[in-house]
Curated annotation (Swiss-Prot):
SMART domains: AAA. Part of the ABC transporter complex PstSACB involved in phosphate import. Responsible for energy coupling to the transport system. This is Phosphate import ATP-binding protein PstB. It comes from Parasynechococcus marenigrum (strain WH8102). The gene is pstB. Disulfide bonds: none annotated.
Length: 273
C-alpha cells in the first residue's frame, strides 16, 4: 500500500479501529466457509477469535492479511479495511499487506538459518538499513527470547526448543515493524510453561502492536485478550456441511461472564465445542 493509495482509497472508520471487517463472506469454490461477518478490531488491544472447529475463525484471521489468496479457489466478498484502506482493492499489493499485518502460525516455523539471520533476513529484504545488531537484539528482547539466544546467535534456529522457536518466530515478525500481529493458535503445540511465556510476551507486545489471536483454549482467551469474538457454525439449508458465522463480539469479560447470546453462554460454559 503506497501513500497515494492511502490518500485515494480511504473509507471512513473510527480512529480506534485497526481493522474493520465489513459483511465478509469467504468461500472455497462454491462452498461458503464463513458468511456475513462484521467486526471492528480495536487498535492496541488483543482480540481473541474463539469457537468450535469448523466455525471459520482461522479463515477470517487469514483474510486479514490476505493469506487466503494463497489457497486455490478461495474468494472473499465484502470489505476488510485497514486504516480505512480496502485490503482487497485492485491496486493493493498483498505482499505489502503482509508486511504491515504479520502472522505467527500454529507450528513454529523458523527459517533454516542462524538465529541471527532469522531476524535479519526479513528486515534486510524489506529495506532495513539501520543497525542490524541492535534490531536483532531489540526484536529478541521484545519476544522475550533474548536471554536464551544471546550467546548462540550464530547457531541454527532449529537448535531452540519448541517454545523458544515460536518466540523466535514472533521476534522475526516484529523485526519488520508490522502494525498488526495475527496469531493462529500459537500455543497449541507448546507445553504449559512455554505457553505462559508466549502469553506474557503478548501482554508486552500489545503496548506496541494490535494483536488478533485464534485459540481453542478459552482460559487463554480470558487471560490474554481484551475483546473476544465467538464464532459458531450452522448446517447449510438444503445441503451438506456447515457455514461459520460470528455470533457475538464484545469485551472479553462480558463474553465470558454476561454474554448476550445463548449459544455463547453454552460454548463458554462447556456445553458444546
Amino acid at each position: 500500500m503506497t501513500t497515494s493509495q492511502l490518500q485515494t482509497e480511504q473509507h471512513q472508520v473510527s480512529d480506534d479501529t485497526a481493522i474493520s471487517i465489513q459483511n465478509v463472506t469467504i468461500s472455497y469454490g462454491s462452498y461458503e466457509a464463513v458468511k456475513n461477518v462484521y467486526c471492528d478490531v480495536p487498535r492496541g488491544k488483543v482480540t481473541a477469535f474463539i469457537g468450535p472447529s469448523g466455525c471459520g475463525k482461522s479463515t477470517v484471521l487469514r483474510a486479514l492479511n490476505r493469506m487466503n489468496d494463497l489457497i486455490e479457489g478461495c474468494s472473499l466478498k465484502g470489505r476488510v479495511l485497514f486504516d480505512g484502506v480496502d485490503l482487497y482493492g485492485a491496486s493493493v499489493d498483498p505482499v505489502e499487506v503482509r508486511r504491515r499485518i504479520g502472522m505467527v502460525f500454529q507450528q513454529p516455523n523458523p527459517f533454516p538459518k542462524s538465529i541471527y539471520e532469522n531476524i535479519a533476513f526479513g528486515a534486510r529484504i524489506n529495506g532495513f538499513t539501520g543497525d542490524m545488531d541492535e534490531l536483532v537484539e531489540r526484536s529478541l528482547r521484545q519476544a522475550a527470547v533474548w536471554d536464551e539466544c544471546k550467546d548462540k546467535l550464530n547457531e541454527s534456529g532449529y537448535s531452540l526448543s519448541g517454545g523458544q522457536q515460536q518466540r523466535l518466530c514472533i521476534a522475526r515478525t516484529i523485526a519488520i515493524q508490522p502494525e498488526v500481529i495475527l496469531m493462529d493458535e500459537p500455543c497449541s503445540a507448546l507445553d504449559p510453561i512455554s505457553t505462559l511465556k508466549i502469553e506474557e510476551t503478548m501482554h508486552e507486545l500489545k503496548k506496541s502492536f494490535t494483536i488478533v489471536i485464534v485459540t481453542h483454549n478459552m482460559q487463554q482467551a480470558v487471560r490474554v485478550s481484551d475483546m473476544t469474538a465467538f464464532y459458531n457454525a450452522e448446517a447449510v439449508e438444503g445441503g451438506s456441511g456447515k457455514v461459520g458465522y460470528l455470533v457475538e463480539f464484545n469485551e472479553t469479560e462480558k463474553i465470558f461472564n454476561s454474554p448476550q447470546q445463548q449459544a455463547t453462554q453454552d460454548y463458554v460454559s462447556g456445553r458444546f465445542g
